[in-house]
Amino acid sequence: NPIENRLRFQSFSDSLKAMEQYVYKMDKPIARKPSKYYAMGVSAITPLADGSLLVLEREFYVPPMFMGSFVNCKIYQAWPSMPITHDKEITADETPVMDKFLLAEWKTNIGLFKRNIANYEGMCLGPQLADGSQVVVLVSDSQGQYANTLKDWFKTIVIK
């Protein structure tokens, strides 16, 4: 799947009334080989005080023999700036997309001697540090410790 998926983000008022919609364009996937299981998408969005969003993109690739499986995660800061109407087609090249800036990227995997694969699916803000940096807390989903391989992981990232 060499496609940069386009997603529709919906904003809401304080009373949960649907407001503006914005188009978010994901990065192209890094997996290039056939897979037994595959998933990619935005698994978490966290709003920031300035109106921008932290967006967690993740790609989960499992090859037929499981060895070489990986989860590639990226956190972007994205700015909703050009709303679209709910009936607007979002696949056209001229459709405005949100600006985004890469803040962090990491990869977990299953190797011959290392099994640290983690499918991060939750994200929230942690404390703000004395220097103004922001802690982001992430949590993975082990699917009930699937195949005795996946584990529950917590990860913290400091954004300067």
Q: Which ranges hold each PLM region?
A:
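Sequence/structural signature of beta-propeller domains
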Residues: 1-160
